[in-house]
Amino acid sequence: MTLESKLKALLGPLVGGRAYPDVTPDKPEFPLIIYQGAGGQERWYVDGKRREKRHQRLQVFVWATTRAQASSIADQIGTALCESDFPAVEPYGSPTSLYEEAIKKYGTRQDFGIWFLPS
């Protein structure tokens, strides 16, 4: 299973399947989750072989109709990721609160470092 498909399977149930990589659909329904890669750690060894495990810095956004709903989903995301079967997950700080005036929605953003086995 790819990292993207595993994230979709893990995060989707928290918002009725509305978890998307990178961008929202054209006509989004809320609440929803957006996740995107934002770099990560890459390590090489003297023998020139790549490590078996890969690392991805993941930014996870929640958009919802209320602050309470956005915060609750963000908390569930942290629990789902940190209790998942990824080899290691590290939250980089707590969620940041957001508000998007153009769509009148409340949001959060939190970054995680995820070690995973590529498929």
Task: Please provide the spans of the model-predicted regions.
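Small/polar-rich, solvent-exposed N-terminal microdomains that initiate assembly or binding
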Residues: 1-48, 68, 72-76
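Sterically constrained small-residue positions within well-ordered secondary structures
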Residues: 26, 49-51, 99-103
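A generic structural signal for short, non-catalytic loop/turn and secondary-structure boundary residues
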Residues: 27-28, 53, 84, 105
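Short, low-complexity, polar/charged sequence segments that are solvent-exposed and flexible
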Residues: 38-41, 52-57, 79-83
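Glycine-rich loops and low-complexity Gly/Arg-rich segments
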Residues: 44-46, 57-62, 84-88, 116-118
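Oligomerization/assembly interface segments of phage tail-like spikes and tubes
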Residues: 52-65, 106-117
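Short, positively charged, low-complexity/disordered linker segments
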Residues: 56-81
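Acidic-leaning, charged glycine-interspersed low-complexity segments
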Residues: 79-119
